[in-house]
A protein has these predicted regions:
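Catalytic beta/alpha-barrel core
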Residues: 85-90, 107-116, 136-141
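Active-site environment of divalent metal-dependent phosphoester hydrolases
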Residues: 91-95, 114-121, 171-172
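Polyanionic/metal-chelating signatures
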Residues: 1-108
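Short acidic active-site motifs
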Residues: 73, 93, 119-120, 151, ...
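His/Asp/Glu-enriched, well-ordered alpha-helical/loop segment
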Residues: 83, 125, 129-138, 142-217
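A generic structural motif
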Residues: 108-116, 120-121, 190-198
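Feature captures the catalytic cores and cofactor-binding loops of soluble hydro-lyases/lyases
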Residues: 98, 117-132
Length: 217
């Protein structure tokens, strides 16, 4: 797995008097950073493919491309060998990153927090992304003002694999209560609500063959 991030967390990392010339400063800048790095990774992969296609005698006369651990990681993403979980809130940014992923040929595994997921649930289903969201957090910063307690149920109704997360050590002890809010607000069945804190997180982590559910015997 690898974690990416969108929104104010990314922009504010470069905020301050001495950091005003750094990129990204805008959401458009964040998008460009993603494209720049993935395009570099694609070119890096092609360099290695070209080198590896040489015969042994040709390799002895040719300098190998420089090993770049950052590009190796991005190539793994492009080749669907590494899963992405992405911090997100706003629908425009969620759409943007799915567009980047679609254009580069990979799939986003999970959007975390994703409090505007209900606005793009159909697009997430089409793309193949899952959701790990808060039950009813809202308005703790400007970009989450549109959060609603029906988010998890709407995502689940659209066929998105949906989990409820805590982001808090104390709340993690009471995820059953967080799941119950999906029953209260979204009319989700108790079984589906339990899946949001058991089986569905296991699916998003690709561990559902080992944890997340129980069977007779």
């Amino acid at each position: 797995f690898i974690k990416l991030a969108l929104g104010e967390n990314v922009k504010q990392a470069n905020r301050g008097y001495y950091e005003r010339i750094r990129c990204p400063q805008t959401r458009m800048g964040v998008e460009q950073v993603f494209y720049d790095h993935f395009l570099r990774a694609r070119a890096y992969e092609q360099e290695w493919e070209k080198y590896n296609s040489l015969s042994l005698s040709e390799k002895r006369k040719t300098q190998a491309p420089r090993e770049d651990l950052e590009m190796n990681t991005l190539v793994e993403i492009l080749n669907k060998e590494r899963f992405i979980t992405c911090h997100s809130y706003v629908q425009s940014e969620i759409n943007m990153l799915m567009h980047v992923a679609d254009s580069m040929g990979f799939t986003l595994n999970t959007f975390t927090h994703i409090l505007e997921g209900y606005k793009v649930a159909d697009k997430m289903k089409t793309h193949g992304a899952g959701a790990s969201t808060f039950s009813d957090w809202w308005a703790y910063k400007f970009e989450v003002n549109d959060a609603i307690p029906y988010n998890a149920s709407i995502l689940a109704d659209m066929g998105v694999v949906t989990a409820i997360n805590s982001d808090d050590a104390e709340m993690a002890r009471r995820l059953n209560q967080e799941a119950a809010k999906a029953v209260k607000y979204g009319n989700v069945s108790e079984e589906e609500a339990w899946k949001m804190v058991t089986l569905n997180p296991a699916k998003l982590l690709h561990l559902d063959d080992r944890v997340g559910s129980i069977k007779s015997g």
